[in-house]
Amino acid sequence: MIRLNIMGIYLLLCDDADEARRLQASCEPVVGVLTDENRDVDFSGISYLVENPEEIDDEDYYRIWQRLKKLPWDILETERCKVRETTVEDVDSFYEIYKAPGITDYTEPLFENPEDEVQYAIDYRENVYSLYGYGIWTVLDKATGKVIGRAGLTMREGFKEPELGYVIAREYQGQGIAAEVCKAILEYGQKELGFTLIQAFTKRENLPSEKLLKKLGFTFDREELLGTEKFDCYILDMR
């Protein structure tokens, strides 16, 4: 077993499956290491397995450590905002944002029971962030650290292209923040996630959203029926 000390944290690299499971059960940040000698060994239950650990850089190891410790990844920063993965501590702020008049006119509401929203955030971390590496993230005011919205990229069931979504607190609207954050997210999607086509859905009467999408380079593609409601689908082609 190797103790890897990087960026102020440590990870344990272990090529013994039973020992790795014991360490993980003790809440130690352990990563299983596959070798030619143990390739047929059962490593089931180990959250992370790697080959050629010397080829993995410190930043990737740090992100593995964050996953094991259930800590959020920092995604990106803009001039005024920070975007990171959502935590359960953000939920109260979401309810404050969503209770403002007009916020849920074009945005799916939160659960009626905050406990359900907390559980959703936990499940989202485990089943979306950990699996895909992207999703809807939390937007913070970089100057104050205050949660001011949500934005990100998701994969809607039945569609091939990722979808841009966002909601910004009412008191922060009209300042260009949505455009600033969404532009950075689109660049992240292209450079870090390899996306070349991104879609967005908006109601025809939602003129501010339509204006923003066009400003970001989206063009109208088609009308789409989502559930029982009609939406305009816009596409951004970054090929």
What are these regions, as identified by a protein language model?
Residues 16, 118, 182:
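Aromatic/hydrophobic pocket-lining residues that form the small-molecule binding cavity
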Residues 6-9, 48-171, 188, 192, ...:
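GNAT-family acyltransferases
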Residues 166-168, 174-191, 207-215:
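Conserved acetyl-CoA-binding loop-helix of GNAT-fold acetyltransferases
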Residues 146, 205-222:
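Conserved active-site alpha-helix within GNAT-family acetyltransferase domains
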Residues 200-210, 227-229:
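Conserved beta-strand-loop-alpha-helix junction that forms the acyl-donor binding cleft
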Residues 12-45:
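Acidic, Mg2+-coordinating phosphoryl-transfer loop and its flanking beta/alpha structural elements
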